[in-house]
Amino acid sequence: MTTAPCVPNASSVARLSGRIQAGIPLAPLTTFRVGGKAEWYCEPHNNLELQQCLAWARAQGIPVTLLGAGSNLLISDAGLPGLVIHTRRLRGMQLLEGGRIWAAAGEPLVNLARAAAKRGWSGLEWAIGIPGTLGGAVVMNAGAHGRAMSDVLVEVQILDEEQEPCRLEPVDLQFGYRRSRLQDSPWTVTGATLQLLPGRDPAQVQRQTQRHLNQRLSSQPYHLPSCGSVFRNPETHPAGWLIEQVGLKGYRIGGAQISERHANFILNCGQASANDIYRLICLAQEKVYQRWSIFLEPEVRILGSFDDPLIS
């Protein structure tokens, strides 16, 4: 979805009422708390503004990066070229009949899980500890405790490559483990509709939701900035176990450390750079592959330029 970059002209920026800004730091907008600046940045407040921003970027011939909660991203210290669109203003939720929930792409997933539990609708208990937005969760097919977004999704609303609104069904999205067709498409998710199981005891659903949250908090390190799970789990063994077996649990490069509690987490211990984290990712891949010939595929989205390539 990119062509040769050019310099956006002042009049085209002005037509978007000053909503597009230059040189905005991205580190505060990610859970890793690292990364450089966005060349151009905007926070649309509705789908019309989103369409305008996408059309502007297309007219300028610059790439677009969508940013939700920033919980599954590693952004280069050099920052990102083109336009970064933050979806945190694109929020809203509707509890429909029969256990259906519609929400906008920027709505935090935890809000949906809590609203469903309060209503006595089962099916999102697992999502309570996932620090992402609905849009990002759909794109990544986020999941936990053996469940995933593809289990509850009935429809996704998108803007296609022409910025026209479309509706897609799960069969259109080629879901897999932490995968969907949306990851490699030029489409922009604007909202989604989920189907849950209504009529349950709200207190029981809320207790189960809280149990999932307690389990997550007890087994995973949330006291320092991280992206969540760094690698997808191979079919043979969990990624964290493989990393621990090659002696990297607690290993540190610069300000970044492979967690001593859960080796599939990398922590920013205070002054980490994106490159520190990236080097730990490369090291974990290298050591695991050397020992077992198992390729650890990153679950975290790695954006921007880094010096050394990952194993592929």
UniProtKB/Swiss-Prot annotation:
Coiled coil: none annotated. It is an enzyme of class 1 (oxidoreductase). It comes from the Bacteria. Its EC number is 1.3.1.98. Keywords: Cell cycle, Cell division, Cell shape, Cell wall biogenesis/degradation, Cytoplasm, FAD, Flavoprotein, NADP, Oxidoreductase, Peptidoglycan synthesis. Pathway: Cell wall biogenesis; peptidoglycan biosynthesis. Signal peptide: none annotated. The keyword Ribonucleoprotein does not apply. One of its GO terms (biological process) is regulation of cell shape. Its cofactor is FAD. HAMAP family: MurB. Belongs to the MurB family. Cell wall formation. This is UDP-N-acetylenolpyruvoylglucosamine reductase. It comes from Synechococcus sp. (strain JA-3-3Ab).
